[in-house]
A protein has these predicted regions:
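Hydrophobic alpha-helical bundle signature of multipass membrane enzymes
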Residues: 24-197, 221, 228, 239-240
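C-terminal membrane module of polytopic membrane proteins
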Residues: 215-243
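Residue-level micro-sites within transmembrane alpha helices that shape
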Residues: 3-4, 160, 203
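Alpha-helical transmembrane segments and their juxtamembrane interfaces
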Residues: 14-15, 171, 214
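Bacterial Sec-dependent N-terminal signal peptides
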Residues: 1-23
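Residues in and immediately flanking transmembrane alpha helices
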Residues: 17-18, 174, 217
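Interfacial helix-loop-helix junctions of multi-pass membrane proteins
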Residues: 189-220, 224
């Protein structure tokens, strides 16, 4: 089992064992990793260290460090948390509704199954490239030093946090398109936070947005996903009073 798969499997196991959740709250991805698009067959790769793209990575890293002591830095530090619970917490305001198993069970179910599915698209590239993270290259702690040791064993390209946040933004925008601008903005910032923390390069984050979009498109080829999305949309309309 590769490192990325081990991390995600552990996360899902923890989610399924949380007391507040029932037994049927274990994630059931819509596709296996082998069924997801193989992004290694695309030209998208980490930039060469002598390229203009990497120069941009460096400039964005320095920008990120410059805002760590600001309110934006505090947001980035909070965004270092990973998983369904942070999605429910951080996207509730832009989505316009509390997201939880109790209040929105169909939306929650959709996210529980869809987000791990989208993450699968990153496993092979992360292990193939094993790109070193900024805090490793510069031999200095990130904004979340307690995360550095486990992250150092996991490739930087693409950003898994960005895939999580952008996938969530796309899914929630489909459920509530009237709030799409606010939802997508939060998804973008969640990815950008990884640059500020120093856990990812900007090119990792940019790749994460693209990977998530490809995974999101793949979801729509699953009949089970489409049925659950319809349930989620109906639930939202009922709770929000929209027709």
């Amino acid at each position: 089992m590769n490192t990325r798969k081990l991390i995600v499997t552990t996360l899902l196991a923890a989610m399924s064992c949380t007391p507040v959740l029932a037994q049927n709250d274990k994630a059931e991805p819509y596709f296996t990793p082998e069924e997801m698009p193989n992004m290694l067959k695309t030209p998208l790769t980490p930039p060469d260290s002598l390229s203009a793209a990497f120069s941009y990575d460096l400039s964005r890293f320095l920008w990120g460090k410059s805002v760590r002591a600001t309110e934006r830095g505090e947001m980035a530090k909070a965004d270092a948390e990973y998983g369904l619970q942070v999605v429910c917490r951080e996207f509730a305001e832009p989505f316009g509704m509390e997201i939880s198993k109790e209040k929105t069970p169909e939306i929650y179910r959709l996210l529980l199954d869809a987000l791990p599915t989208c993450d699968e698209i990153s496993w092979n590239p992360k292990n193939h490239f094993m790109r070193r993270r900024p805090f490793m290259v510069f031999h200095e702690p990130s904004l979340k030093p307690e995360d550095d040791a486990p992250l150092s064993k996991n490739g930087s390209f693409p950003s898994g946090h960005t895939i999580l946040g952008w996938s969530a933004a796309l899914l929630l925008s489909e459920i509530n398109p009237d709030r799409a601008e606010a939802i997508v903005n939060r998804g973008y910032l969640y990815g950008e936070s990884r640059v500020i923390v120093g856990a990812h390069w900007q090119s990792d984050v940019n790749a994460g947005y693209l990977y998530a979009s490809v995974a999101y498109a793949k979801l729509h080829t699953s009949d089970r996903f489409l049925k659950q999305m319809e349930k989620a949309r109906k639930e939202f309309k009922k709770l929000s009073g929209k027709k």
